[in-house]
UniProtKB/Swiss-Prot annotation:
The gene is FAM111A. Residues 336-611 are annotated as: Interaction with SV40 large T antigen. It is found in: Nucleus; Chromosome; Cytoplasm. Its main location: nucleus. This is Serine protease FAM111A.
């Protein structure tokens, strides 16, 4: 379609409509409300990098009309419920009949009640979630032809925290090769080390939330997600894939034709920055080096600021201009802080101990994963907050054990992707030993004829005051890994937190403003936890923590994490000590403790002498 024709299809703006949403959707005029077959408005080029929105749809369905096909489009009926806080429209179910060729947003705007709510919630984002016939959070650009007859949706409004550009537009769908619509679902939280967040809307970035993505047959998976408009822009350039049921991989280049009704997670692969191609002309390469460096630094303001600080620091401290002083300064500034090497004996011991570390996963109201380990006999230990994620919100505690027994599985052999969910154990419908304050929970494996790995408990070993520790777990739901990290002594916790908060504020103030010194008071003086630096974040909760000799000393629980440039970073991480967990079990669950630990001597955990 020519630009001239595109402009001829634009309609006047209804100034009474929500101005924020108008940036993405053209309001429906009274003439359009009475004409179900009205063509769609405002078509923009797909290649326009400005054409992005926060959570609203970016694609309208506007099929091309052939001269021989002049029949009137059929209507489609859906039911709309307004979930708003005032009585006027609260929980009203509205019947909506409109042309199936129109988008959901255009159809909704024919309802006076919806238009009033848009006007009432100016500056907020409208979210539409399917409840019957179609599920999850729906793209407002989806054509009604994709909806089943009689489908039901619920409308809510979310306060927008992002600042949208004034020139944002919506996309037309003139380039589709097929009129057959395919709907599939994407979990709002991605998996993988590099980028956990994949959606723009903060309200959608929660566990259990899923987005209904629509596409047309012949399009690729990457086309569908990038054109959807609700996902972050890195999906256009980075390498990623879809994971189905934790055992099937679909690359983003695959067609969407067979994806109808299926659920996926987005796994983002670590993006490697390609090295610059070698210059054909060495002299030209030399001439361009300085210019290239300046261009790179200009793209990263924080890098430029930090480099200027380092240079200024060198100028202040370098009083003696000799090579020895310069070497000492470099060694002090950039040298390693903590030795993280281990003897071969300890490494071999850790490999043996890793056999008892399990990948715990579930599929209930939500899906998720965590880490656990064999504690004693058939009993495994994990974090209490993991149980909260498994059972979901609003469930009676009396039903927790049943839910756990139905949906939780554990495998100890997940060291390669093919072994992710093989040879697993179910757990008993039993949930009695736990503590929310210390964040631990004991579950019991259900015997199935497989050999249970050796128990890791072999007495109480005090946590090290400093030095090196090892964490074994499944961060981000990935294959089993070991992380060697440094203990932050209790006396240095407050100072370390303060230093890191200040440094993060200087680097990226908008990302760490939610943390203050008060945020860390709960762990700064808490003797029941051990603090350390680690790159184990989501999915590693419940990982055993070993000292430098291979003795079990704690269980990794949580940390103060934040997201910067789509990457997860941390101020400080911590875990509950085994000494505190055992003492709490002995005091609060004495009968169980005596039954399970009777006649067990408090001997040291396996050490390198056992090899």
């Amino acid at each position: 379609m020519s630009c001239k024709k595109q402009r001829s299809r634009k309609h006047s703006v209804n100034e009474k409509c929500n101005m924020k949403i108008e940036h993405y959707f053209s309001p429906v005029s009274k003439e359009q409300q009475n004409n179900c077959s009205t063509s769609l408005m405002r078509m923009e080029s797909r290649g326009d990098p400005r054409a992005t929105t926060n959570t609203q749809a970016q694609r309208f369905h506007s099929p091309k009309k052939n001269p021989e096909d002049q029949t009137m489009p059929q209507n489609r009926t859906i039911y709309v419920t307004l979930k708003v806080n005032h009585r006027r429209n609260q929980d009203m179910k509205l019947k909506l009949t409109h042309s199936e060729n129109s988008s959901l947003y255009m159809a909704l705007n024919t309802l006076q009640a919806v238009r009033k709510e848009i006007e009432t919630h100016q500056g907020q984002e409208m979210l539409v979630r399917g409840t019957e016939g179609i599920k999850e959070y729906i793209n407002l650009g989806m054509p009604l032809s994709c909806f089943p007859e009689g489908g039901q949706v619920v409308i809510t409004f979310s306060q927008s925290k992002s600042k949208q550009k004034e020139d944002n537009h919506i996309f037309g769908r003139q380039d589709k090769a097929s009129t057959e619509c395919v709907k599939f679902y994407i979990h709002a939280i991605g998996i993988g080390k590099c980028k956990r967040r994949i959606v723009k809307c903060g309200k959608l970035h929660k566990k259990g939330r899923k987005l209904c993505v629509y596409a047309f047959k012949g399009e690729t998976i990457k086309d569908a997600l990038c054109k959807d408009g609700r996902f972050l822009s890195f999906l256009e350039n980075d390498d990623w894939k879809l994971i189905e049921n934790n055992d099937t991989i679909l690359e983003s280049t695959q067609p969407v034709d067979e994806l109808e009704g299926r659920y996926f997670q987005v796994e983002v692969e670590k993006r490697m920055v390609p090295s610059a191609a070698a210059s054909q002309n060495p002299e030209s390469e030399k001439r361009n080096t300085c210019v290239l460096r300046e261009q790179i630094v200009a793209q990263y303001p924080s890098l430029k600021r930090e480099s200027e600080k380092i240079i200024e620091n060198f100028k202040k401290k370098m009083k003696v201009k000799n090579g020895e002083t310069l070497f000492e300064l470099h060694r002090t500034t950039f040298g390693k802080v903590t030795k993280n090497s281990s003897s071969i004996k300890v490494v071999k011991l850790l490999v043996r101990l890793s056999d008892s570390v399990g990948y715990l996963f579930w599929d209930s109201a939500t899906t998720g994963y965590a880490t656990c380990f064999v504690f004693k006999g058939l009993f495994i230990l994990t974090c209490r907050h993991v149980i909260d994620s498994i059972v979901g919100d609003g469930i009676e505690p009396s039903k927790w054990a049943t839910i756990i027994g139905q949906c939780v599985r554990v495998t100890f052999g997940y060291e390669e992707l093919k072994d992710k969910e093989t040879n697993y154990f179910f757990v008993e419908p039993w949930f009695e030993i736990h503590n929310e304050e210390l964040d631990y929970a004991v579950l019991k494996l259900k015997e199935n004829g497989q050999q249970v790995p050796m128990e890791l408990y072999n007495g109480i070993t005090p946590v090290p005051l400093s030095g090196l520790i090892h964490i074994i777990g499944h961060p981000y739901g990935e294959k089993k890994q070991i992380d060697a990290c440094a203990v932050i002594p209790q006396g240095q916790r407050a100072k370390k937190c303060q230093e890191r908060v200040q440094s993060k504020k200087a680097e990226s103030p908008e990302y760490v403003h939610m943390y203050t010194q008060r945020s860390f008071q709960k762990i700064v003086h808490n003797p029941d936890v051990i603090t350390y630096d680690t790159e184990f974040f989501f999915g590693a909760s419940g990982s055993p923590v070993f000292d430098s000799k291979g003795s079990l000393v704690a269980m990794h629980a949580a940390g103060f994490a934040y997201t910067y440039q789509n990457e997860t970073r941390s101020i400080i991480e911590f875990g509950s000590t085994m000494e505190s967990i055992l003492l709490d079990i002995k005091q609060r669950h004495k009968p169980w403790y005596e039954e399970v630990f009777v006649n067990q001597q408090d001997v040291e955990m396996m050490s390198d002498e056992d090899l």
